[in-house]
């Protein structure tokens, strides 16, 4: 039973800040219009393993951490809030 509990916490610690699938691209976006459209988005320059790291990294650049569909010309058409961020 103890192994299961430890394995469960280890797995959740390794969880990504963005879900797999459509919204799998972590981006730092200057603006999030209607909580749906990311504007002036940039790829993080460090590994963003946790929501707190992702949030701090984007905030240092004046941006918001978002999980988006593949961006085109620095514009992400569909974005959602990253896991573990506020």
From Swiss-Prot:
Disulfide bond sites: 18-67, 28-58, 29-41, 68-79
Key words, A-Z: Cell wall, Conidiation, Disulfide bond, Secreted, Signal, Sporulation
Keyword 4Fe-4S recorded: no
Expression induction: By C and N starvation, and by light.
Nucleotidyltransferase is among the record's keywords: no
Disruption phenotype: Leads to wettable and fluffy colonies. Results in thinner hyphae and impairs the formation of aerial hyphae.
UniProt xrefs under InterPro entries: Cerato-ulmin_hydrophobin, Hydrophobin_sf
GO (cellular component) term, any one: extracellular region
Signal peptide: 1-15
Compartment list: Secreted; Spore wall; Secreted, Cell wall
Pfam families attached to this UniProt entry: Hydrophobin_2 (PF06766)
Highest rank taxon of the organism: Eukaryota
Protein family: Belongs to the cerato-ulmin hydrophobin family.
Function: Aerial growth, conidiation, and dispersal of filamentous fungi in the environment rely upon a capability of their secreting small amphipathic proteins called hydrophobins (HPBs) with low sequence identity. Class I can self-assemble into an outermost layer of rodlet bundles on aerial cell surfaces, conferring cellular hydrophobicity that supports fungal growth, development and dispersal; whereas Class II form highly ordered films at water-air interfaces through intermolecular interactions but contribute nothing to the rodlet structure.
The protein's assembly and partners: Homodimer. Homodimers further self-assemble to form highly ordered films at water-air interfaces through intermolecular interactions.
The name this protein goes by in its record: Class II hydrophobin 2
